[in-house]
Amino acid sequence: PGILIIGFPMPGTIDTTQFRRILSRNFALPLIVGALSVAVFVGITAYLVHVLNLVEHTQRVISNTNETAKLSVDMETGLRGFLISGDESFLSPYIMAKARVSDDLVMLKELVAERPGQVDRLRRVESAQRQWYVFADEMIALRRANGDFVTPVSSGRGKILTDDVRREFKDFLEAEQTLRQQRSETAKSVITWSVVAY
């Protein structure tokens, strides 16, 4: 009765090497796969956030450009009202917008600084806008002095300058809208691949 046999494992016991192998297979491997999965998910999420920030940045540029172009139109409208009526109150939109347009163009150049083509377009906008300022200031001076402002206006010089400003704004906006579309498509693609991958 009660004989103890040494050296033989008891039924249902496992040696420590075999236990560690089973433990690593059933615990460590899923843990590693889970950690890699989390790392990939975090990477995809970070990239998606980056792409969405680029879309938002481009939208901000488009919005600011539209506002600046509107100010340019306000200046033209104010000038026209003053030339027709001689009423100085028509110049208030011109004066207010003129001060803001230059600052807005500087800000836009900073927003697109990483894209030299867009910076060049904004420089052309600035150049065309400065030429229009010279024309507008000449017309204002002539109107205030009761001089002949009709002949220079009738020559179409102001319209040509205004059309130049509008064309440059249009080209700039088209490039930004194309970029926004590309970035939006990239974001959609990242979302699609993320969903498919998981």
Where are the language model's segments positioned?
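Heptad-repeat alpha-helical coiled-coil/4-helix-bundle sensor or tether segments in soluble regions
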Residues: 71, 82, 91-179
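Short loop-to-helix capping motifs
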Residues: 86-88
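Positive-inside N-terminal membrane-insertion signal
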Residues: 1-32, 193-194
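Juxtamembrane amphipathic/coiled-coil helical coupling segments that flank
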Residues: 11-19, 42-56, 76, 136-198
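Amphipathic alpha-helical segments and their boundaries
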Residues: 23-75, 112-129, 152, 183, ...
